[in-house]
Swiss-Prot record:
Keyword field: Chloroplast, Membrane, Photosynthesis, Photosystem I, Plastid, Thylakoid, Transmembrane, Transmembrane helix
Annotated protein name in UniProt: Photosystem I reaction center subunit VIII
Signal peptide range: none
Family: Belongs to the PsaI family.
Transmembrane regions listed in the UniProt entry: 10-30
Membrane topology reported for the UniProt record: Single-pass membrane protein
Annotated source species: Gossypium hirsutum (Upland cotton)
One Pfam assignment: PSI_8
GO CC list: chloroplast thylakoid membrane; photosystem I
Amino acid sequence: MTTFSSFPSIFVPLVGLVFPAIAMASLSLYVQKTKIF
Protein backbone atom coordinates (compact mmCIF):
# COMPACT_ATOMS: atom_id res chain seq x y z
CA MET A 1 0.00 0.00 0.00
CA THR A 2 2.89 2.36 0.70
CA THR A 3 4.29 1.94 -2.81
CA PHE A 4 0.84 2.49 -4.32
CA SER A 5 0.24 5.66 -2.30
CA SER A 6 3.68 7.06 -3.18
CA PHE A 7 3.26 6.21 -6.87
CA PRO A 8 1.07 9.22 -7.83
CA SER A 9 3.42 11.65 -6.05
CA ILE A 10 6.20 10.49 -8.40
CA PHE A 11 4.08 9.85 -11.49
CA VAL A 12 2.24 13.19 -11.58
CA PRO A 13 5.33 15.49 -11.60
CA LEU A 14 7.03 13.15 -14.08
CA VAL A 15 4.14 13.48 -16.52
CA GLY A 16 3.91 17.21 -15.80
CA LEU A 17 7.56 17.65 -16.80
CA VAL A 18 7.99 15.03 -19.53
CA PHE A 19 4.80 15.74 -21.49
CA PRO A 20 5.44 19.51 -21.98
CA ALA A 21 9.08 18.72 -22.88
CA ILE A 22 7.95 16.29 -25.60
CA ALA A 23 5.35 18.77 -26.81
CA MET A 24 7.92 21.59 -27.06
CA ALA A 25 10.43 19.31 -28.78
CA SER A 26 7.90 18.15 -31.37
CA LEU A 27 6.73 21.74 -31.89
CA SER A 28 10.29 23.00 -32.42
CA LEU A 29 10.99 20.16 -34.87
CA TYR A 30 7.77 20.96 -36.72
CA VAL A 31 8.71 24.64 -36.95
CA GLN A 32 12.22 23.78 -38.19
CA LYS A 33 10.80 21.36 -40.75
CA THR A 34 8.27 23.83 -42.15
CA LYS A 35 10.76 26.71 -41.72
CA ILE A 36 8.16 29.27 -40.63
CA PHE A 37 10.82 31.26 -38.76
